[in-house]
Amino acid sequence: MATNTFKQQVDSIIQSRHLLQHPFYIAWTEGKLTREQLRHYAEQYFYNVLAEPTYLSAVHFNTPHFHNVENSGDISIRQEVLKNLIDEEHGEKNHPALWKAFAFALGADDASLTQADALPETENLVATFRDICINEPFYAGLAALHAFESQVPDIAAVKIDGLAKFYGMKDPDSYEFFSVHQTADIFHSQAEWAIIEKFADTPEKQAEVLAATRRACDALWKFLDGIHENYCANLICEEKTAATLH
């Protein structure tokens, strides 16, 4: 498969499930969510924030040190994944800490973050990414990460704007998680794609990348379905009414 066609297929999968098209995020951009609904979202997504470093650890583990006939990969890939992992967990402003600052600004606390029962869709999100990153080749794991991180810069910009405009969140410390990812994930997703493009060099490997991309996008979409259906009944009623009127 030609490289440009392969990239187009990956991009098409991502665009068909782009998270900014989800009703929950649309409601966010329109200021229709309550702070309580956002808090529930923050508590649920915290499960994924804590799990993200383990996805990277799994890809790092699965990446061979050397490239040969039997194994594709090399130390440069391991180093790139390690840089991403360090970004996630190193220092006082590690990403779980930044997410906690966001959640606390919405009224959450340590107890609500650690004791919130994970929705089935939340459990599915974490389980799906872990399964791909642990049990599939490294380039498929990177495809799952790329499926999400390639969307994040646009999502983060919209979230920051909505938080300031509709929810009075104007302290940069409260939304630093998003501002950090708005920039960092441009580079992360570009690096991930460069590796995928280089090492998914057969039709079979490219098929694995496409399958991982679909699974990741579906799990992310279903996660927002879970938030929307469990915490946003008022919005669902409005949407059904609007659909009926049209």
From Swiss-Prot:
| Physiological role | Involved in de novo para-aminobenzoate (PABA) biosynthesis. Acts as a self-sacrificing or 'suicide' enzyme that utilizes its own active site tyrosine residue(s) as the substrate for PABA synthesis. The side chain of the tyrosine residue is released from the protein backbone via cleavage of the C(alpha)-C(beta) bond, leaving a glycine in place of the original tyrosine residue. Reaction requires O(2) and a reduced dimetal cofactor.
Q: What is this protein called?
A: 4-aminobenzoate synthase
InterPro entries in alphabetical order:
Fol-rel_CADD, Haem_Oase-like_multi-hlx, PqqC-like
User: What's in the misc comment field?
Assistant: Can complement the PABA-auxotrophic E.coli mutant lacking pabA, pabB and pabC genes.
Q: How does it assemble?
A: Homodimer.
Detail which positions bind Fe(2+) 1. E88, H95, H181
Q: Which residues bind Fe(2+) 2?
A: E88, E149, D185, H188
Q: Which domain of life is it from?
A: Bacteria
Q: Which cofactor does it need?
A: Fe(2+); Mn(2+)
Q: Which UniProt keywords apply?
A: Iron, Metal-binding, Oxidoreductase
Instruction: List where the protein spans the membrane.
Output: none
Pfam families from the xrefs?
A: Haem_oxygenas_2 (PF14518)
Report the co-factor binding details: Binds 2 divalent metal cations per subunit.
